[in-house]
Amino acid sequence: MPTTTDTPISPATATMLVRLEKYVLPIICGFLAWQRLRYLQQQYTAWHFVNSHPGMSLFAPRVFYADLTKNFLIFAIQAFTGLTLLSNRAPAVLPDKLKHVMVPLAASYYMILYGLVGYFPMSMQQSMLPDAWRFPVAMAALACSIIGYAIAVWAIVYLRRSFAVFVSVRDVVTNGPYRLVRHPIYCGYLLDAAGLLLAASSVGMLLLCCGYVVLLVCRARMEEEMLAKSDPAYRHYLARTGFLFPRLASLAG
């Protein structure tokens, strides 16, 4: 029996949703990018104030610059996403099922749910790490997030006008990071999720990250199914590239 998300959508509805993707989602991305830019400014102002008053410095410079880099990459992703959505090509094949819209939207804005960790029981919020491990693990978490966001920005730059939120068919990109892996943007997002999980090291964050992984994998599989159905050459691409992470043979070649 088909589920609710398998419900077909009409071409007229799909066209309206694609227009929403092109003209409304960029506004949301622009707002998020502007908010991140304001946060970066506040972060720098606070750092400058602390360092201009001897004895008030709380963080090592390397930690501050790493966190600043991470937040700049988040800003870059949000800005690039909005710009690429505005300039993307019309899809050759429109989304034809409700899941092609709902799953990508849920995956794209799932990060909002990370704030729910604060409403979990205290036992699910507490870090499972010993005190002595927390700082080095936090640094590893920051590194994971920076690498993840850098990979995502790199992939969006190569995807350009083929970038989309909803599952549809546009030109297949096979150069840059796509030469090694079919979903480098999602690879980057998963590394960021790993960073969040390491930073929190709590049961609550583990549950939320597991939900995010499921959504990303479902989204990627739907994209591949639609592309393989519409483009025979994509099947050869499937055979020689990794899903979310590069194959060892691809790296050796």
Q: Where does each model-flagged region fall?
A:
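Membrane-anchoring alpha-helices and their flanking helix-loop junctions
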Residues: 1-166, 195-253
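Solvent-exposed interhelical
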Residues: 170-188
